[in-house]
Every structure is written in structure tokens, then in C-alpha cells.
Amino acid sequence: RGLGDVYKRQGLYDSRMGYSPFQRGAPPERETQMEETILTAQNLKFRYDSDQPVYALDGVSTEVKRGEFVAVLGANGCGKSTLAKHFNAILLPESGKVYVEGMDTADDDKIYDIRQTVGMVFQNPDNQIVATVVEEDVAFALENLGVPPEEMRRRVDDSMKMAGIYEYRERAPHNLSGGQKQRVAIAGVVAMRPDCLILDEATAMLDPRGREQVMQTIHYLNRNMGITVVSITHYMEEAAQADRVLVMSKGHVVMEGTPKEVFSQTEKVRSLHLDVPQAAELRDELVKAGIPMPEGIIDTGECAQALYELLQ
């Protein structure tokens, strides 16, 4: 069946949605937008097994501003994915609080609104794709919500264009590359018009080209659409492009700051069993070799510029 058949089905608009979908307009200036907090964790504690003494999250307190791009780093088992799942109430705190736009995730009456506000994209796109045609998959959740057919058509088309998959709209997802599939999953979430997008290792299974395509899409959504992004990742080059970086270890946030503030502490980052961006590593090696290099280099452009100036 085609998407046209989906749109012809009668659906009732769910008045609880309480928004006019896709009428977002131009995003506010980032400085103004990022004054407002959208996600808050207060002394958050969580265990997967209440009979065990080890906490996956042990007193985590942090917040994310509206419009911000936050990267969360940490070794395997540090709690970063567990934290992500608390931000849209997939998991609930054992103690402490998590708020999404002021809504308590422990409030059953707010779960619907919280999951409208915060969308998630997971590591394996095949686990989120449910339809046999790309545009049908992007429309799937909207159909379930009873979004009017004309609005559904507009939102599906706009989301596919933003994710760079409009040309694949009539293709079968299983014939797409990993990066293209992940962008289908992103389009499906974006069509719901979330204010915040959580990426849980969303590029981990992709090749370098696929990672680049997905991250270009994510940065477009953040910069041009004003969507808040929290990216759980182990790719340092991705984290270096964020507004802010959180580093977790054993259920705690142990480092926090801008990418320059965090990655300039190369020895501390390595002590947490993490890599640093290649440019930062090269800068350290050049300094060890007696070549003066400025502090805070975290990308190849900065490194190349510093070397160019030294050679003048």
C-alpha cells in the first residue's frame, strides 16, 4: 500500500497534543534560546537490580538548556545511556528527580507530553524502522496519533527533506545504507515535532561516511530548527562539535564544560579510558617535541592554522 492510502484513512485528531504541528517558524537567537532549561536531573539515582549495591546512576545532577547541543561521553557501563533513557521516561529514578520542561517524569499524567517533547534515536536503526516504504515509516507515529491527512503529508515531506532522504521516499528501507536508514529513523522522530532529540549512540554502527551524513543532519536540526540535542557518543570528533560536553564515570558526572575546556585536560580524559580528538593528541605530541602550540586545540582546522602561523 502507498502512503496515499494512509492519508485517506479516517483519523481523529488527539486534542491532548495541544500544538499546531510544524508551525515552528524561525528559531530564536541561540543566546536567548539557551537561557531556558529544558532537561533537569536532580540527585538522580538508579539501579537496574535493587538487590545489588551498585548504582548505574549515583547522584547525577545536571541540566540542559533549550537549543543546546550536549555530548555525553564515558567508558562502557558509565551510565550515559541510562541517563539518556531517563530524559524521556523510558526509565524512572529510584530516587531524585528528572524534569522535562518542568514536568516530573514520575508523573504518569505527564508521560504522553514528555514523550512528545523528547524524541529518541537509538544505535540500531533497524530497531526503529517498522514499515516497508520510507515515507510510510516516517508517517507511522503520526498516523497512530490521528494527525489530519493534509498535516501528515506536509510534516512527512518536510521531515524527509530536512533529513536528506526525500529522494528515497518510495524505496524500501532495507535497501538503504546504514547512514540512510538512521536518517529515516531521525525523520520519523522529527516528524513528531519534538523540542529535544536524544541520540543514544546513533552513529555507533555506521561507517565514516554514514556518520558524517547523520551528524550533518543533526547539526542542521539543532542550528536551523532550534531542536535541543543530547548525543551519547564515543566519537571524540563528534563531541568536539558540541556546545558542551559531559563526561561520566561509574554513575557520576566527573567532567563538564565546553569541548575546549574538557579536551584541553588530555591526561584526565585519558585517565577515564577515553580518547581525545586527534587534533588535541597531535598538539600534545608537537609540544612534547618542543614545538610551541597554543592551548585548547581540538579540531584539525585550528591545528593547521597554528602550524601555518608558526611557519610564517
PLM feature segments, named:
Residues N88:
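Helix-to-loop junction immediately C-terminal to a conserved catalytic motif
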Residues A172-L176, Q180:
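Conserved ABC ATPase signature
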Residues L73-A75:
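The feature captures the beta-strand-to-loop junction immediately N-terminal to the Walker
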Residues E150-Y168:
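Conserved ABC ATPase "signature" region
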Residues R1-Y7:
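Short, small-residue-biased leader/transition segments that mark boundaries at the very start
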Residues G96-A106, I114:
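Conserved ABC transporter NBD signature motif
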